[in-house]
């Protein structure tokens, strides 16, 4: 996100029992992301589209503001989305009022429907820094998937580690459509033991020198090494797990890439 080692992470929200609401995306964060990254990157969109057929039922958990879901709808696919953030889903509905999306904790999403294809783009699975919750989440994805279907997702790797900072600094400063100044200040700390990248941020909206609104975000990501997830995915029932290092589906061989792309089926 925002060109400071966040470029891979899509703007989505998770909660799943985290009472401090870490990684919850509020209105200022949503507005900044929509200005900077309104559309899905073409190569990434093409990668996720490559798994589709028009007769598929598709689910995008953590769908955010719809950078991927809306282009899928525009191409005629039967797709549904889930996200916790009402701010993000409001943006999505502005783009596609008839989109089938649900504001929900995915672990509490109650449905009998199974899907042919489930995808989570842009490294958003890395937002789960509690590995117990992450495993529950992945198990839920397997439960929602039809036999023979595909579950495809991306995670950030240890190559995305940021240098530690002692103080907050201005990382992004942009103008809104009202010509207000929207500023992000952040700092970084990496926990070697847990592979957690902590990047707390402060979003501020100014009209001249007047502070109109401030929003604090406890942004955290888990940075993966190759081999960290594969065994668990097999343990929960996926019989085929392939790991790529690029949208061209090059097989991952080491940690010298900023993302891993997982293709799972059973």
Where are these regions (language model features)?
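Conserved class I S-adenosyl-L-methionine
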Residues: 12-64
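A short acidic, Gly/Pro-enriched loop at the edge of an enzyme's catalytic core
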Residues: 110-118
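A short beta-strand submotif of the Rossmann-like class I SAM-dependent methyltransferase core
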Residues: 120-122
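A short glycine-rich, Lys/Arg-flanked "PGG" loop and its adjoining helix->strand segment in the class I
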Residues: 135-147
């Amino acid at each position: 996100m925002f060109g400071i080692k966040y470029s891979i992470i899509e703007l989505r929200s998770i909660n799943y029992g985290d009472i401090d609401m870490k990684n919850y995306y509020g209105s200022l964060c949503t507005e900044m992301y929509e200005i900077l990254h309104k559309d899905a990157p073409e190569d990434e969109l093409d990668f996720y589209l490559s798994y589709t057929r028009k007769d598929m039922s598709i689910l995008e958990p953590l769908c955010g503001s719809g950078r991927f879901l809306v282009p899928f709808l525009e191409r005629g696919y039967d797709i549904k989305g889930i996200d916790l953030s009402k701010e993000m889903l409001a943006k999505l509905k502005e783009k596609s009022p008839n989109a089938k999306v649900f504001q929900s904790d995915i672990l509490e999403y109650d449905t009998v429907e199974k899907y042919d294809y489930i995808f989570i783009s842009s490294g958003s699975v890395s937002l789960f820094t509690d590995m117990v919750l992450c495993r529950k989440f992945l198990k839920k994805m397997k439960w929602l998937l039809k036999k023979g279907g595909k579950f495809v997702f991306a995670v950030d790797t240890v190559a995305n580690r940021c240098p530690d900072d002692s103080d907050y600094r201005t990382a992004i400063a942009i103008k809104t459509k009202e010509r207000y100044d929207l500023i992000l200040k952040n700092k970084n700390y990496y926990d070697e033991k847990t592979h957690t990248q902590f990047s707390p941020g402060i979003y501020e909206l100014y009209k001249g020198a007047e502070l109109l609104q401030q929003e604090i975000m406890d942004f955290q990501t888990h940075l993966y090494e190759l081999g960290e997830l594969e065994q668990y995915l097999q343990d929960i029932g996926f019989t085929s797990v392939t790991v790529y290092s690029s949208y061209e589906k090059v097989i991952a061989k080491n940690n010298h890439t900023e993302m891993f792309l997982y293709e799972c089926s059973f």
